């Protein structure tokens, strides 16, 4: 919580509080109303308080007609200075900025003083390689402190980074390098993931070979992560330890509206979308939501986030906002359940994390192992569990609250996207605790975010009437400022503003209940149409995972000559349960009980579901296998064995039909 906000909260309580039970909701409504009615003043005060500026802005925001919002126009700052330098003249100088561990037991503690030293080394190396303001640098790194440092070094020079998730293959990497026009690629020789060596430099070489003479890359800067022998191209490839010498590099001031980074969304077909985030607005918006929605409002708060630096969460809530606000982050270079199921709990206990950030799928994965693993650890430091990336159904919500949090944590579920940069719907436990609701109920529109639900005609829906989630301008500061290589905004308009002109449509299905909570039901394009009824895949999965035997589930719609689409469920059971026809019937009845006879799913038991390495279930892959089609881009697939599981289940289903 900021100082001004604390004062306002106290004043409001003294003046307006009539019933103590209503206090928190009253304050949320007051704060939200203020943010919507006076967005320039609301965000302007926060920007002054939280961020260090070289030059003040001339205009708080400029709303492009029918498009996006530009914030803090005319202001100048540097992201690296805000995340590093400004902490050195305070008590934070020797405070831990990063706690890091690998799956092999390697450990590092990086203080803010260390961070300053390392960022300058990397910035000096990049400058020696010719990187200057406005250049693009592709970062293809594992989840290490060096991956975070590389981002800050690029930003220090006023250049633009484009981080590519280390799980992507050569073609996906090549596409992103080419689209960004990257002058330099930063990578590591290799790293370990679930005990297997992943050779990153080899993939970079393959990507550049694909591009051939069309490659924009002049240099490849290689960090020796494992010491693995790698191919080396003289004149192009450079080892970091040969050029990474310390020299103070003055942070380059940039306009608040200039790009800080490009982050490509992982579409299944077509050209990847390069989402561009600004420097000023992005730093302000993400910092505010770190304090409010992630709840890191106290100086000694520690954030353990299981995301990756290649995703937007890894930009906003592993790299920038925690460091800008001088907090400590915990990062683990592997899956949270490797090499043993309670590794994540061990990390929380060891580093006394106060906020644990993860996905609903990750929680469901951990649930499979039971409660005993969790109970071995003292997790009393936790105040808040943050989940995002997909709908959170009841079972993982309850497990997180009761098993992980001992009934004492706040479950801060959020909705946001790569495009929006930070949370737009959820709770603000860093300010006040609002009553929690479980299931697909995400929470409320967060301050500064005009979020609602509309029908096909673009009119606001009634309570509990399903429709389309939309955002109205002015959009919050951390939201994207455009798409790379889209100078006339044609692709931007077609992708986000064509369904409802002037209104941002992210593609999700939602409703608002009678208490004002927004329920996000999942992607509109994942809606299953059964006998003229629109059913969200997430709705079905929420009900299925409330069955005591079910750990995880994925629902997909398959064309059916009678119903239009039939619901097929792929179910992972908890430890101690075994697949059987009787259990399949139980699960079917469980779904029928809550959703009616129209939704009687076919149940397929599998040991694992295909997921991305960020923990999202790849429903399109399941559907493709079911229909005998190509699975498309599966470079982010965590475990290819999960594909075999689906294929096996489909074959067994087909055999049963022929018997």
Swiss-Prot record:
Tell me one GO biological process term: carbon fixation by 3-hydroxypropionate cycle
Classification via PROSITE patterns? AMP_BINDING (PS00455)
Question: Catalytic site residues?
Answer: 525
Q: Which GO terms describe its molecular function?
A: 3-hydroxypropionyl-CoA synthetase activity; acetate-CoA ligase activity; AMP binding; ATP binding
Please list the residues that carry the modification N6-acetyllysine: 616
InterPro entries for the chain: Ac_CoA_lig, ACAS_N, AMP-bd_C, AMP-bd_C_sf, AMP-binding_CS, AMP-dep_synth/lig_dom, ANL_N_sf
Which catalysed reactions does the entry list for this protein? 3-hydroxypropanoate + ATP + CoA = 3-hydroxypropanoyl-CoA + AMP + diphosphate
Q: Which Pfam families match?
A: ACAS_N, AMP-binding, AMP-binding_C
Q: What is its EC number?
A: 6.2.1.36
**Keywords assigned:** Acetylation, ATP-binding, Ligase, Nucleotide-binding
Q: What does this protein do?
A: Plays a role in the autotrophic CO(2) fixation pathway. Activates 3-hydroxypropionate to its CoA ester. Can also activate propionate, and to a lesser extent acrylate, acetate and butyrate.
Q: Which family does the similarity line name?
A: Belongs to the ATP-dependent AMP-binding enzyme family.
Q: What protein am I looking at?
A: 3-hydroxypropionyl-coenzyme A synthetase
> Which source organism does the UniProt entry give?
Sulfurisphaera tokodaii (strain DSM 16993 / JCM 10545 / NBRC 100140 / 7)
């Amino acid at each position: 919580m900021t100082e001004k906000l604390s004062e306002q909260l106290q004043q409001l309580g003294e003046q307006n509080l009539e019933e103590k039970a209503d206090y928190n909701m009253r304050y949320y409504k007051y704060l939200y109303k203020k943010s919507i009615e006076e967005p320039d003043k609301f965000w302007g005060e926060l920007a002054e308080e939280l961020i260090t500026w070289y030059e003040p802005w001339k205009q708080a925001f400029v709303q492009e007609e029918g498009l996006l919002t530009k914030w803090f126009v005319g202001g100048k700052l540097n992201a690296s200075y805000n995340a590093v330098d400004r902490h050195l003249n305070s008590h934070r100088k020797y405070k831990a900025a990063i706690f890091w561990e690998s799956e092999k037991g390697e450990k590092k503690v990086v203080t803010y003083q260390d961070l300053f030293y390392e960022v300058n080394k990397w910035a000096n190396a990049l400058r020696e390689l010719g990187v200057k303001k406005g250049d693009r640098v592709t970062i293809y790194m594992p989840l290490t402190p060096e991956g975070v440092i590389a981002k800050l070094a690029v930003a220090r020079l006023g250049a633009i980074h484009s981080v590519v998730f280390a799980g992507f293959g050569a073609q996906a990497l090549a596409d992103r390098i080419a689209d960004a026009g990257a002058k330099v690629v930063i990578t590591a020789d290799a790293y370990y993931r679930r005990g297997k060596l992943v050779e990153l430099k080899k993939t970079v070489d393959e990507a550049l070979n694909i591009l051939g003479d069309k490659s924009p890359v002049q240099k490849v800067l290689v960090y020796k992560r494992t010491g693995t022998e790698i191919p080396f191209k003289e004149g192009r490839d450079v080892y970091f330890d040969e050029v990474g010498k310390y020299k103070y590099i003055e942070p380059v001031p940039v306009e608040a509206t200039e790009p800080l980074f490009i982050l490509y969304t992982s579409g299944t077909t077509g050209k990847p979308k390069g989402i561009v985030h600004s420097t000023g607005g992005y730093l302000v918006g993400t910092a505010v939501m770190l304090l409010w929605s992630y709840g890191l409002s106290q100086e000694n708060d520690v954030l353990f986030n299981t995301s990756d630096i290649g995703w937007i969460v890894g930009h906003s809530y592993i790299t920038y906002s925690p460091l800008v606000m001088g907090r400590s982050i915990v990062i683990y270079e592997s899956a949270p359940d490797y090499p043993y199921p309670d590794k994540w709990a061990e990390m929380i206990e060891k580093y006394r994390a106060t906020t644990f950030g993860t996905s609903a799928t990750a929680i469901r994965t951990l649930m499979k192992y039971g409660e005993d693993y969790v109970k071995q650890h003292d997790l009393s430091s936790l105040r808040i569990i943050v989940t995002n990336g997909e709908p959170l159904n009841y079972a993982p919500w309850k497990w997180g609250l009761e098993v992980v949090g001992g009934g004492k944590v706040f479950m801060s579920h959020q909705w946001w996207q790569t495009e929006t940069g930070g949370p737009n719907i959820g709770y603000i436990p860093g300010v006040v605790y609002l009553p929690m609701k479980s299931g697909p109920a995400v929470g409320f529109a967060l301050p500064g975010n005009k979020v609602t639900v509309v029908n096909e005609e673009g009119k606001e829906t009634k309570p509990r009437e399903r429709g389309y989630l939309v955002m109205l301008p002015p959009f919050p500061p951390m939201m994207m400022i455009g798409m790379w290589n889209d100078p006339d905004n044609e692709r931007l308009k077609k992708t986000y503003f064509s369904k409802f002109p002037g209104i941002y449509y992210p593609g999700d299905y939602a409703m608002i209940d009678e208490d004002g909570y927004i329920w996000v039901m999942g992607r509109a394009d994942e809606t299953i149409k059964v006998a003229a009824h629109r059913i969200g895949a997430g709705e079905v999965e929420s009900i299925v995972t409330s069955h005591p035997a079910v750990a995880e589930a994925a629902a997909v719609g398959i064309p059916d000559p009678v119903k239009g689409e039939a619901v097929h469920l792929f179910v992972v059971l908890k430890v101690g349960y075994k697949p059987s026809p009787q259990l399949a019937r139980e699960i079917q009845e469980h779904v029928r009980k809550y959703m009616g006879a129209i939704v009687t799913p076919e149940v397929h038991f599998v040991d694992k579901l295909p997921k991305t390495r960020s923990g999202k279930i790849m429903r399109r892959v399941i559907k493709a296998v079911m229909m005998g089609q190509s699975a498309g881009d599966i470079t982010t697939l965590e475990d290819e064995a999960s594909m075999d599981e689906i294929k096996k289940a489909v074959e067994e289903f087909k055999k049963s039909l022929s018997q």
